[in-house]
Amino acid sequence: MNTSLPRATAPFAGKTGRLVPESEGAPVPQVKAPTDAPNILVIILDDVGFGSFGTFGGPVPTPGLDLVAQKGLRYNRFHTTALCSPTRAALLTGRNHHAVHMGGIPEMANGFPGYDTIIPPEAATVAQVLRMNGYATGCFGKWHLTPMWEMGPGGPFDRWPTGMGFDRFYGILGAESSQYEPPVYDQTTPVSPHLGRENYHLTEDLVDQTINWIDRVSVSSPGKPFFCYLPTPAVHAPHHAPREWIDKFAGQFDAGWDAL
């Protein structure tokens, strides 16, 4: 796997002569991932405590996650900043959040070292590294890593997902949004996916978009691995749960968290 960013242009490997018969073209360079490169899916749920999941003995049943855990590994010791943007920045760059200028959230940016929320270009994301080594990359959900003054549809887009290694982006840029009428961006274009769709819910939309993208990559580029980053806005406030799920848990938490 290439470890230098950006990838250097390969020197000409053919030969040129005075005439065509004396010349030999070189193969057209194409970046391809290693044959054993795995697909990678990273799912982040916002503001969910370690003790909430049924997988770890919590009160919320999570059968899908339980199945994944049974077939993989469960970690019970980890460290985060307990803040949204710093944790995401550290996860995507592999660096301390202060080193990539994300000591707080973009809404609280200031001029002190490590807190201006301007991720420097030399801090490559895992998406940039993987894309330059033959991966398809997609981000679906909450980004929250763009400086506030760069969030408009007029750009600049350097620190939007599409400028930081993701071929495909569908989601929200900010900290929180309505699940029913969200300010969604498709790449860098603002869209209103809820219009004309009864019972629309952002989390369901994001999952559908993720599945569709993975299917398209698999069909259009067989054998090409993907890196998919799915940071859902849920369960961050505002807490807009679908009615069917509210009804499903009716009465179970009426006594409050102290009774659990």
Each model region followed by its residue ranges:
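Formylglycine-dependent sulfatase
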Residues: M1-L260
